[in-house]
Amino acid sequence: MAKNYHKVKKDTNHTAIVQLLRAHGATVIDCAALKKAFDILVIYNGEVYIMEIKSGNGKLSDGELECKASVEKHGVKYHVVREFDQVLSILGII
């Protein structure tokens, strides 16, 4: 049976973004160890958000692109986030 997880290599801003979200009362489920999946599932104010965290000019891997396409074909937004203000804006905090 194939493993559905891999050695976690998180972007440098991953932990800080998760901490920021939790400080604003969001529930964050960290999925970074899953293959071909988004980094975090965020639940905030009655909404669910799928987010892929990238630092700098980081690009989506082939597996992440596959996940993004799968999520979006069901009409769900797949957010690629890099900065604190961007994350807070998506949640409507700023």
How does the language model describe each region?
Residues M1-I94:
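Catalytic phosphate/metal-binding cores of nucleic-acid and nucleotide-processing enzymes, i.e., regions
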